[in-house]
């Protein structure tokens, strides 16, 4: 089981990304993270939510991005998913600088950022069914 959990659903609008980031950070603060750890979590959540909005739903603001966070012992698990277009090749998408939308002038560093700021990252996706991102951060304090 888990010690605590939260759930949040937001419309796929870019203005909701900061709310999602702040909400997960507030939830994580019960683990007494350092300022750097909190910044890492906020950045990773921001990247995942932005990916759902821009790539999963192609900026269609009437869809739902779902976020859950769980605390067990000293570990935070954050799950962010959409029911968007999915990722055809997850391994390719996780390569630094890869972007499926070069027309948007994005850097293609979202998954790289998530990997570097969290202790674990798992991406599950199915074409035309959506993407689920599972991230973990372990606290040693």
Curated annotation (Swiss-Prot):
Belongs to the anti-sigma-factor family. Its EC number is 2.7.11.1. GO terms for molecular function: ATP binding; protein serine kinase activity; protein serine/threonine kinase activity; sigma factor antagonist activity. It comes from Clostridium tetani (strain Massachusetts / E88). This is Anti-sigma F factor. One of its GO terms (biological process) is sporulation resulting in formation of a cellular spore. It catalyses: L-seryl-[protein] + ATP = O-phospho-L-seryl-[protein] + ADP + H(+); L-threonyl-[protein] + ATP = O-phospho-L-threonyl-[protein] + ADP + H(+). Keywords: ATP-binding, Kinase, Nucleotide-binding, Serine/threonine-protein kinase, Sporulation, Transferase. InterPro entries: Anti-sigma-factor_SerPK, Anti-sigma_F, HATPase_C_sf. PANTHER family: ANTI-SIGMA-F FACTOR RSBW, ANTI-SIGMA-F FACTOR RSBW-RELATED. The gene is spoIIAB. Binds to sigma F and blocks its ability to form an RNA polymerase holoenzyme (E-sigma F). Phosphorylates SpoIIAA on a serine residue. This phosphorylation may enable SpoIIAA to act as an anti-anti-sigma factor that counteracts SpoIIAB and thus releases sigma F from inhibition.
């Amino acid at each position: 089981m888990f010690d605590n959990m939260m759930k949040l659903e937001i419309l796929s609008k870019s203005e909701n990304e900061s709310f999602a980031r702040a909400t997960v950070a507030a939830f994580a603060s019960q683990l007494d993270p350092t300022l750097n750890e909190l910044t890492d979590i906020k950045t990773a959540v921001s990247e995942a939510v932005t990916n759902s909005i821009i790539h999963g739903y192609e900026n269609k603001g009437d869809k739902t991005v779902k976020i859950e966070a769980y605390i067990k012992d000293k570990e935070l698990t954050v799950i962010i998913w959409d029911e968007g277009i999915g990722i055809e090749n997850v391994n390719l998408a996780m390569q630094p600088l890869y972007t499926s939308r070069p027309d948007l002038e994005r850097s293609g560093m979202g998954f790289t950022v998530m990997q570097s700021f969290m202790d674990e990252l798992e991406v599950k996706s199915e074409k035309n069914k959506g993407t689920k991102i599972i991230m973990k951060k372990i606290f040693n304090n």
